[in-house]
Amino acid sequence: MARTLLNTSGFNTYSNPSKLKITDMRIAVLGHGNWRWPIIKLYTNQGLIGLGEVRDGASARYALMLKSRLLGENPCDVDRLFRSLTQFGGAGRLGGGVCGVEMALMDLAGKAWGVPCYMLAGGKHRDRVKCYADTPARPDPEEMGNLLKDRMVSGFEFLKMDIGVQ
């Protein structure tokens, strides 16, 4: 019996990663009130769906403009696809669409290969991550202080303040 160097027990047997192709891209918007979180959904010919978040107010419409560059492509080819998408601007608010697509590609690649997508990004480096609390600016210093104090009482050790100079 031939000895294999690759343990295939963890692979998704319903997926053939080398023949995986993106067939559609859609946006689902989650949220309520003034808060909206566009989620990119990449669909494949093998029934896998990859999800990625369009970050902090970036344009979901811009993300959809990238669709034509993705259809028919193998989502496991994350780096090449990411580089082709960043030709059209990667910084600022437009970059959020590209970042969301990259997340969805990594999600698909991880599902296709049967591994968590963090393994595709270099592996696990820690067991826990500390979160910070963003705090929008308030014109009244006392009100700002109370907001920060409330976040500290809630258990946050790291605080971010959106302040400006006027």
Question: Predicted segments — roles?
Answer:
Residues Q46, W113-A137, V165:
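N-terminal small/glycine-rich loop or linker at the start of catalytic domains
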Residues R128-Q166:
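Metal-dependent enolase-superfamily TIM-barrel catalytic cores that perform enediolate-based chemistry
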Residues M1-T4:
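N-terminal secretory signal peptides and thylakoid transit peptides that target proteins
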Residues L6-L51, R55:
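Structured beta-strand/loop patches that form or line metal/cofactor-binding pockets in enzymes
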Residues N45-V115:
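Metal- or metallocofactor-binding catalytic centers and their adjacent structured scaffolds
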Residues S15, H32-G33, G123-H125, M152-V153:
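Solvent-exposed alpha-helices and their adjacent loops that cap or buttress functional pockets
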